């Protein structure tokens, strides 16, 4: 959790604040404040209160005006919060000003998300990616850690000299810390370059084998990992918590027509996902960019389902994957009335021209429809046919096994008779060997 400045104990009660300026934004800001409550609760911190603060204008010092800032200070005192969490992204200087005003820990939405990511990271790659994002966030904020030296020096025996000595010590240490942080950032970036190369090698091997790929994307906690577990028949960690999955998990499945498909689960998205996290996780999120198509999972039971769908598209556009072919899975339809399901499909229609598959992943309903939708998606990439290969071309038989899926093999007088599903490019090369011409 977050350490309170000048106190060794940990944060127990946080007051949540969202500052907004346009009255028409009040509804959306309230929804985001509710989401922030879920995020903070995922850190094990109690909620002392949450408040929407309307400000006429944006101010550089506190984001809102001084009068509103004093109002926030009083609210924090009244609810006995030991931390104030802003849904707004605060600049380093705004964060410092707020901490001076309320005399408690002040953090923003980005720091909350970074802390959750740090707790969820399991693999070396995910740990490095989160560490990189956190250090880039902390670098311009290092002066906060030494604020207490100013206060201690100014209030203890040395008068001006004591304060200057404390400040001097703090300033020297800040510079040392910054140099160490920059060196660590560079070291992490070098290590992540190696990870990116390893991923590229793995992708080339998959391309050589001509195995189709799909990436499962969507808002955090929409049911992506549960979907992968269902269709692959293998256990994938799926927990009812935000950002349970930070590491990509890939499973090979077989579609109804026999073609193999590699399905990859990806990290969940969220509104205002910090750009530095998107950058840090680029090597992981490339799985979505380079997949043949996407499966976006939408929690149909969530009142913000359409907004979550739009947020996912925004992040995909940022990654350069916004134009990928996509299947949309409306998950948890067992929890919503029929008319709500129809309304959702209508609301998605202006944004999406692909296939919508209603499912209840938890109940196992709709799996067949999804697999058939995947077959339809890949039909333009593969062909199924019978081939008669002369015995003198055993190299082609071996290639058919490695490049596609062979269903049957029969040895006849003229050669080897095979029924197979092949990628279109390889199929075209073998058209002269079609058995049913």
From Swiss-Prot:
Record domain Hflx-type G: where: 212-382
Gene Ontology cellular component terms for the protein in this record: cytoplasm
Gly residues: compositionally biased ranges: 152-167
Names of required cofactors: Mg(2+)
Annotated SUPFAM superfamilies: P-loop containing nucleoside triphosphate hydrolases (SSF52540)
A Pfam family the protein falls into: GTP-bdg_M
Binding residues for Mg(2+): 225, 245
Molecular function via GO: GTP binding; GTPase activity; metal ion binding; ribosome binding
Annotated region (Disordered), positions in chain: 150-173
Superkingdom in the source lineage: Bacteria
Keyword presence, Manganese: no
Compartment(s) of residence: Cytoplasm
Primary location: cytoplasm
Keywords, in A-Z order: Cytoplasm, GTP-binding, Magnesium, Metal-binding, Nucleotide-binding
Residues annotated for GTP binding in this entry: 218-225, 243-247, 265-268, 331-334, 360-362
Similarity comment: Belongs to the TRAFAC class OBG-HflX-like GTPase superfamily. HflX GTPase family.
Function: GTPase that associates with the 50S ribosomal subunit and may have a role during protein synthesis or ribosome biogenesis.
Assembly and interaction partners: Monomer. Associates with the 50S ribosomal subunit.
Protein name: GTPase HflX
Native organism: Akkermansia muciniphila (strain ATCC BAA-835 / DSM 22959 / JCM 33894 / BCRC 81048 / CCUG 64013 / CIP 107961 / Muc)
Name of the encoding gene: hflX
């Amino acid at each position: 959790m977050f350490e309170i400045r000048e106190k060794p104990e940990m944060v127990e009660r946080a007051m949540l604040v969202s500052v907004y300026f346009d009255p028409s934004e009040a509804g959306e800001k309230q929804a985001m404040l509710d989401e922030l409550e879920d995020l903070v609760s995922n850190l094990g911190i109690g909620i002392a209160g949450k408040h929407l603060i309307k400000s006429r204008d944006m101010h550089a010092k506190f984001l809102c005006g001084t009068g509103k800032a004093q109002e926030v200070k009083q609210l924090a005192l009244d609810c006995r919060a030991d931390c104030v969490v802003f849904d707004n992204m605060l600049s380093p200087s705004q964060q410092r000003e707020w901490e001076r005003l309320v005399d408690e820990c002040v953090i923003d939405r980005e720091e909350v998300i970074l802390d959750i990511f740090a707790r969820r990271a399991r693999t070396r790659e995910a740990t490095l990616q989160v560490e990189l994002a956190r250090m880039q966030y902390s670098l311009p904020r290092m002066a906060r850690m030494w604020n207490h030296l100013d206060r201690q020096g100014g209030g203890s025996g040395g008068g001006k000299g004591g304060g200057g000595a404390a400040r001097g010590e703090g300033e020297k240490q800040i510079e040392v810390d910054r140099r160490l942080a920059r060196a660590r950032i560079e070291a992490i970036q070098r290590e992540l370059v190696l990870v990116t190369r390893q991923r590229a090698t793995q992708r080339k091997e998959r391309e050589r084998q001509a195995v189709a790929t799909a990436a499962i994307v969507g808002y955090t906690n929409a049911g992506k990992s549960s979907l992968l577990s269902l269709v692959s028949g293998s256990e994938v960690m799926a927990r009812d918590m935000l950002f349970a999955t930070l590491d990509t998990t890939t499973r090979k499945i077989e579609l109804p027509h026999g073609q193999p498909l590699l399905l990859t689960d990806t990290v969940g998205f969220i509104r205002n996902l910090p750009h530095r996290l998107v950058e840090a996780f680029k090597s992981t999120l490339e799985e979505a960019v380079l997949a043949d198509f996407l499966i976006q999972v939408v929690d149909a039971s969530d009142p913000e389902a359409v907004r979550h769908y739009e947020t996912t598209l925004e992040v995909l556009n940022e990654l350069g994957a916004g134009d990928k072919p996509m299947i949309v899975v409306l998950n948890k339809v067992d929890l919503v009335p029929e008319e709500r399901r129809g309304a959702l499909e209508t609301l998605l229609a202006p944004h999406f021209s692909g296939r919508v598959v209603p499912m209840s992943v938890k109940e196992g309903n709709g799996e067949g429809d999804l697999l058939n939708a995947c077959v339809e998606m890949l039909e333009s990439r593969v062909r199924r046919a019978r081939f008669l290969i002369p015995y003198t071309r055993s190299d082609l038989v071996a290639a058919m096994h490695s490049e596609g899926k062979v269903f049957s093999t029969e040895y006849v007088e003229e050669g080897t008779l095979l029924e197979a599903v092949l990628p279109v490019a390889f199929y075209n090369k073998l058209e002269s060997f079609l058995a049913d011409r």
